Amino acid sequence: MTCILFAHRDAEYFAPKLKQTFPAVKVITAPDLPESVPRFPEADVILAAGHGFNDERLAKARKLKWIHAMTTGFDAIAGSRALGPDVILTTTRGIHGPQMAEMAFLYMLNLARDYPRMHDNQKKHVWQRWTQVRLHGKTVVITGLGLIAEALAPRCKAFGMTVLGVTATPRAVDGFDRMYAYSQLEQAAALADFLVVLTPYSAAMDSLINAKILAAMKPGAFLLNLARGGLCDESALLDALRNKRIAGAGLDVFRTEPLPKQSPFWDMDNVLITAHCSGSSDDNLAMTWPIIETNMRCFLERRQAEMINLVRR
């Protein structure tokens, strides 16, 4: 009997569907990956968020044949030395574009209009006005040209913004005014009013946003990171924020998560923090189930080549 370990906060939603659709499988659930590790030796299949894996955990999964990441990112899995070469890896790529684009706008509007200050004034019953920054006419630079960037670009255009892209292989993409290679990131960053990081994480991309890139940005520019914490040199970012070399940042991801309570980021007036939730939406579950169902059927019927979002390793 195929044993499926579903280690995710939404496992209890999907487990009955799996049992009903595939009655011949055994389903074990856990609220998250750490709590599920003792069950790793039993698992033929693991479904979990893509960022919680490491060599020590994967080494326990001796029967493992397939991992499905309940996220777009899979760097913590694919980069593991303990992952056998024959283990199948799939992701939930394709469902997060609209909500992550909306989160980028939440950051841009809040930072540009200084909404935290407005909200604080409301609580204090203070009537105060200041010059507002509008998005119309501003330049947004987006690193990483996947489905999320393709969802964000037309929304930026609808706001009257100039949209520049940074990617490994520059090419014409609808919604983008101009493309740059990663080797030209410093040049692109100098043009940005908003630099939005959507690049997939890899060792080669670690600290993509570093002191050099931050120094190239305008003093009035904002950095948004919705991808992975490892893409940003956090020490360099803290220095740039403290010394007002950039205007502020919207950060959904960090190198250490949850963000430690003692982190200086928490107390910075020019930083907006969210808890790695930019991909969340009220219809994620409904959009995810068809991917899981299709891939499970393909896996059980040995049609692995037909699985959705199959990662080539």
Residue ranges and their predicted role:
Residues 1-45:
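N-terminal glycine-/charge-rich "phosphate-binding" loop or analogous flexible N-terminal tail
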Residues 44-119:
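Phosphate/diphosphate ligand-binding glycine-rich loop within oxidoreductases
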Residues 54, 170-264:
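Rossmann-like adenosine-cofactor binding region
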Residues 90-103, 117, 257-313:
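C-terminal helix-to-coil terminal segments
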Residues 98, 149-150, 211:
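Residues forming the Rossmann-fold NAD(P)(H) cofactor-binding site
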Residues 118-151, 178-179:
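Glycine-rich NAD(P)-binding loop of Rossmann-like domains
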Residues 158-175:
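NAD(P)-binding Rossmann-fold cofactor-contacting core
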